[in-house]
Amino acid sequence: MIWRWVVVTILSAVACFHSSSHAQAVRISYSGLSGQNLPFWVTYEADLYKKYGLNAEMVLISGGLTNMQAVMAKEIAFTYLGGASPIQAIAQGADIVVLATAYGLMPYGLIASKNIHAAAELKGKRFVVSRLGGIEETAARVALDRLGVGARNVSFLQAGPDPLRIAALESGAAQATMLAPPGLFAATSRGLNLLADLGALKIKYPASVVSGRRSYLIQDRAVAKRFLMALIDGLHVYRQNKSFAVKVLEKYTKLTNADILSQSYDYFAKNNPLLPVSDGETIQAAVPTDKPGNRKVEEFYDNSILEELEREGFAKTLSK
């Protein structure tokens, strides 16, 4: 339960009234167990959706493509995932839009099995990702190109969440993967080799975005606004209360090593914005270059609700 040090405002009082009398059911999802999902989990665990009048059901749907399919089928209202899948869907004409960018840097490290010490040794080897076509494969291609290996020289295989991919490297079933904290730190603590840290390079990329249907934004804008109010509140709780956030990270990742959990929190918290607006340069990094047409980058995201909340001074009330 959220600590009661958040300043009570007229806005939150109204939201609380609505939450107790007319809670709006909303189904939301997240795509994986990496640390960049932590603000989303904190928002849920701190009961902030209820605070803003939403009765949220949160589910894990592994992989960006499957999340997009659920959103387009109207099974999910909002999903928290890497930017590649929604941006790809928008490029193909889908009724999708990015509503917020909660983490705008590439946070992955290239991890190799214990017997591989240089990137050149990865040629001809098996490279596992959680889902083919997802953000980890994108990160892998960036890393391999920067290391001079070339993604065409490895075989990409789908292997599921972090623990399964770490196990694949330890068993010899695969030789490399991409991991974000806490999986990244868990892997290196087990003796697996870090060949490249994309996070240290500060590469702009929409690693964690909120996406939904553009038509939903038009038809149920009030619900979308309350959802984003809850997320902004969650970002403030996440940044201001490390001990609570670390407990949430432990719950979702099932990791118990206090050093890894703390290190993972610190890795992300320093770069998480309190107002998760999207910017064109970050979004552009995930726009496919092989799609015809003259679509402008601004067509991929909509900051209008966040800008409205900024004009209203919403985030400032949470920082007091």
Label for each model-derived stretch:
Residues 1-3:
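N-terminal secretory signal peptides that target proteins for export/translocation
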Residues 5-16:
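Bacterial N-terminal signal peptides
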Residues 17-23:
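Sec/Tat signal peptide C-region and signal peptidase I cleavage site
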Residues 24-161, 165-171, 175-181, 194-198, ...:
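Short, glycine-/small- and polar/acidic-enriched structural segments
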Residues 84-85, 156-157, 163-252:
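Pocket-lining segment of extracytoplasmic ligand-binding domains
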Residues 134-154, 229-260, 299-304, 308:
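Ligand-binding clefts/hinges and TM-proximal coupling segments of bilobed small-molecule sensing domains
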Residues 218-294:
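Secondary-structure end/capping motifs
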Residues 288-320:
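Conserved C-terminal helix/tail region of periplasmic/extracytoplasmic solute-binding proteins
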